[in-house]
Amino acid sequence: MLRAGVSTACLYPRVVEEALYDLALSGVSNVEIFINSHSELRRSFVDTMARLLHRFDMTCASLHPFTCEIEPTMLFSNYPRRADDYLEYCRHYFSAMQ
């Protein structure tokens, strides 16, 4: 089944937690959370967003990294250390998605 959703990025430049709250109040039940900074990957911040999702019975369908614009350079160059470092950094995103 196809489910429509809304990204917190649609409300940029509002900070992500305010955007998520606004979407919740608007009755949006399926969201993408667009991470805009490294600090938004901290466990305490992620836990706050998870509580908000739970409170409003929302589903996060995807977590969109702010680093997506550099992924081609980080992953597909002839510099293996850069790719290794970037994959290590991505662990922050993977952890946030759990």
Q: Locations of the language-model features?
A:
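N-terminal pre-domain/capping segments
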Residues: 1-98
